[in-house]
């Protein structure tokens, strides 16, 4: 089909190549012989062979033999005979330059190889492979808000003598002041026994007060062993139990108008009976006057 276009170009190129060779000019090395592809050349060769074989009896048959149409892509004839038949005139007609179509196809340069695939990217080692961590999600870093407000800082600065913890009482105060800054202190971290300040009032629950009152009525003075037992039972310290009993004895003295607290339970009972007798006498005196 395309021989009408390829053959004139081929003849012109041959003439130009001969003229260039006579003038001493170099021919483009990228040129290759423009023969047909084996499939196209095979089609024309099969048609020429059929014409040679059935040429004498083709006039009596209106149609071509069915074998020619049964195979759309016939294989090329053997290399011993020509492409156009026994004398090879069909081959010379379609390929005047000589050589078989298979040889011309093999003489053509191979297509360039495909470029190798790019190597896989290295495994990601965290956020480092994505650039800056600040711009990882397209947002800037959030500004950290200060923990303390100006009012809280002012309150903490008022107590520079506070220590970082109550367990460092035996250490040097100068060393503690240098190691701990006021911005790291919280109100609940302040020790109870700070110098120059009054201690907060200790509050007792209803259950603790009731148990302490029972113990006081049983014995106003506690031994060391009993004080430890009471402090463990009520989840208090020995010092808190000791102070509570001291305050309770002072209260009893004020209520009974006595300078000395009774040592034994018998003295307590005697004092109560005397107090009841005095109250009865006062009531009788008021009744007589009325």
UniProtKB/Swiss-Prot annotation:
Coiled coil: none annotated. Residues 197-256 bind DNA. It holds the Pfam family Homeodomain. Residues 60-69 have a biased composition (Low complexity). Residues 108-124 have a biased composition (Pro residues). Sequence-specific transcription factor which is part of a developmental regulatory system that provides cells with specific positional identities on the anterior-posterior axis. This is Homeobox protein Hox-D8. It comes from Pan troglodytes (Chimpanzee).
């Amino acid at each position: 089909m395309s021989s009408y276009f390829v053959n004139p170009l081929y003849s012109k190129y041959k003439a130009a190549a001969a003229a260039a060779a006579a003038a001493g000019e170099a021919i483009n090395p990228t040129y290759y012989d423009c023969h047909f592809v084996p499939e196209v050349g095979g089609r024309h060769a099969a048609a020429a062979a059929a014409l040679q074989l059935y040429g004498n009896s083709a006039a009596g048959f209106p149609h071509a033999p069915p074998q020619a149409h049964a195979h759309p892509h016939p294989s090329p004839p053997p290399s011993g005979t020509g492409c156009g038949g026994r004398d090879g005139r069909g081959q010379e007609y379609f390929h005047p330059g000589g050589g078989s179509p298979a040889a011309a196809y093999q003489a053509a340069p191979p297509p360039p190889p495909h470029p190798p695939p790019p190597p896989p990217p290295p495994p990601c080692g965290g956020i480092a492979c994505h650039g800056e961590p600040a711009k990882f999600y397209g947002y800037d870093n959030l500004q950290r808000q200060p923990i303390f407000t100006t009012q809280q800082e002012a309150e903490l600065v008022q107590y520079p003598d506070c220590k970082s913890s109550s367990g460092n009482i035996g250490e040097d105060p100068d060393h503690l002041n240098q190691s701990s800054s006021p911005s790291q202190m919280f109100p609940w971290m302040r020790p109870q026994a700070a110098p120059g300040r009054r201690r907060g009032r200790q509050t007792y629950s209803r259950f603790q007060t009731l148990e302490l009152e029972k113990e006081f009525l049983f014995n106003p003075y506690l031994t060391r062993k009993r004080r430890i037992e009471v402090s463990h039972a009520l989840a208090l310290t020995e010092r808190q139990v000791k102070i509570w009993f001291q305050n309770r004895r002072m209260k009893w003295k004020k209520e009974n108008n006595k300078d000395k607290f009774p040592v034994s339970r018998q003295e307590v009972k005697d004092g109560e009976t005397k107090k009841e007798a005095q109250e009865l006498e006062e009531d009788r005196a008021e009744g007589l006057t009325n």
